[in-house]
Amino acid sequence: MTQHWPAGEIARMILDGFDDYREHFRRITLGARERFEQARWQDIQRAAAARINLYEQKVGEVNGWLRDGFDEEVLLEVEQWPLVKSAYIRLIDPRLDDELAETWYNSLFCSLFSHDQISDGCMFIHTTRPSIRSHERAAQTRTYMPDGSLKGLVRAIFRDYAFDYGDLESDLSRLEEQLRDCLPDWVCKDPALAVELFVPVLYRNKGAYLVGRLYNSDEQWPLVIPLLHREGHGIEADALITDEAEVSIIFSFTRSYFMVDVPVPAEFVNFLKRILPGKHIAELYTSIGFYKHGKSEFYRALINHLASTDDRFIMAPGVRGMVMSVFTLPGFNTVFKIIKDRFSPSKTVDRATVIDKYRLVKSVDRVGRMADTQEFADFRFPRGKFEPECLAELLEVAPSTVAVEGDTVLVRHCWTERRMIPLNLYLEQASEGQVLEALEDYGLAIKQLAAANIFPGDMLLKNFGVTRHGRVVFYDYDEISYLTEVNFRHIPPPRYPEDEMSGEPWYSIGPHDVFPEEFPPFLFADMGQRRLFSRLHGELYDADYWKGLQASIREGKVIDVFPYRRKGR
């Protein structure tokens, strides 16, 4: 029977499905320039969500093809799937997106088989792609030399990256000035100075980005030039950024995914890795929309870390969650979040609602203020990789999710997020200046989320974290909702003097009612922090402020949230 088993046909059908997915993905991506040039901001948001949802949609379609095309008993004969893998390897070897094709195959395998049938013999737990490939080319870039004139250098760049600029001469003068401010004088005068830019433009939300590097014979600097569309005034170059930390934030895990046409994804990711060496390739793949492959690279990094270190899982620092239990590896910059079997009495959500909320985050504009998540099923870890106290707590609070099978710990379902310092813990150790900066950014995070039609729900300090760049980011999603679903109210005046002394409200409260006047004691036990936040962001305590945001959203307005400092604006 083995010699007649349709391994090649199954492999071909899986790859045909991948080609179909890539074609639809590219079609959405290639529309980004037109949407940007025509200022179709709401279409941009819809396209971003559609492209994210496309992957699972296409996996489902190909699963149906396979089940319709082959006898189920034959198709699900897992012992034969090493033959499918071998046939598939031969098919993808000549491709320029072969690493993505491996991840696609894995997704199809997991859609057909239970996770206890996963093995490297049947699927690509470890990649088969060589680090250096015979078909690998230099990245698709353009190189520019100043030839004694920085303005001439900038002009040459914008000659190649042609848009309907509103006032290009003004832009060129400003960018030349910013370039001189960014680099030491000797670098600006260095005859060996050059600029290398990736040819395709990156698009995201209301911006377009030219991405590359400045370099001479000794050093290099990342280079990003954001373009904005000023409605009625044309396209303008908004800034010139060479600071690695700022460029890293532009590619942050808190941002929506870029739309950029990359026929050879590994080339571009390697190019980005050269200018952002602190970024893991999983994050770089994710940042350009290949979030499933980012998940594959994350998993490979995790199993490599577990195999090569003595690190053990511990409970994550901070206040224990009422809905989620969170654990981490000290040497691996990630937290693992599982849903508890029983929630605290004050929580009215159920498990299905929590899952929906976390999945919602993937498809909305996170405006740099919500951590991206990856959802996993059936993680298996060596029992010896858990500290006993950590494993005991997980088994106690989530026995339906965490189980011990011999020497293996099975985690049936979890999310991963980037690890941050919880804001409440950060403030306990912060200097006066750091407290001021953190509370300023905390309020700004709430405002930016709200303007993007996201209401965090539970805005306690413990539900926000501080990144390595000092940015405040929201990461607890079990109570998020669209801002337009919330009914913001003023507290009605008391009917009688006794009302104010009562422990019960004298007014009715609906399920979606929120009273911003109640925020101060709810958010801040520390009176000094409460007064400081009121001075910085007191409008957040006014129901009319929130209603004004809702009105803007209902009018179709899309806010500007810049992932970089806007110098000279």
Curated annotation (Swiss-Prot):
One of its GO terms (biological process) is glucose metabolic process. Its main location: cytoplasm. Transmembrane segments: none annotated. It catalyses: L-seryl-[isocitrate dehydrogenase] + ATP = O-phospho-L-seryl-[isocitrate dehydrogenase] + ADP + H(+). InterPro entries: AceK_kinase (IPR046855), AceK_regulatory (IPR046854), Isocitrate_DH_AceK (IPR010452). Keywords: ATP-binding, Cytoplasm, Glyoxylate bypass, Hydrolase, Kinase, Nucleotide-binding, Protein phosphatase, Serine/threonine-protein kinase, Transferase, Tricarboxylic acid cycle. The keyword Nucleotide-binding applies. Its EC number is 2.7.11.5, 3.1.3.-. It holds the Pfam family AceK_kinase. The active site is at 372. One of its GO terms (cellular component) is cytoplasm. ATP binds at residues 316-322, 337. GO terms for molecular function: [isocitrate dehydrogenase (NADP+)] kinase activity; AMP binding; ATP binding; phosphoprotein phosphatase activity; protein serine/threonine kinase activity. It is found in: Cytoplasm. Bifunctional enzyme which can phosphorylate or dephosphorylate isocitrate dehydrogenase (IDH) on a specific serine residue. This is a regulatory mechanism which enables bacteria to bypass the Krebs cycle via the glyoxylate shunt in response to the source of carbon. When bacteria are grown on glucose, IDH is fully active and unphosphorylated, but when grown on acetate or ethanol, the activity of IDH declines drastically concomitant with its phosphorylation. PANTHER family: ISOCITRATE DEHYDROGENASE KINASE_PHOSPHATASE (PTHR39559:SF1), PTHR39559. Belongs to the AceK family. This is Isocitrate dehydrogenase kinase/phosphatase. The lineage of its organism: Bacteria, Pseudomonadati, Pseudomonadota, Gammaproteobacteria, Pseudomonadales. The gene is aceK.
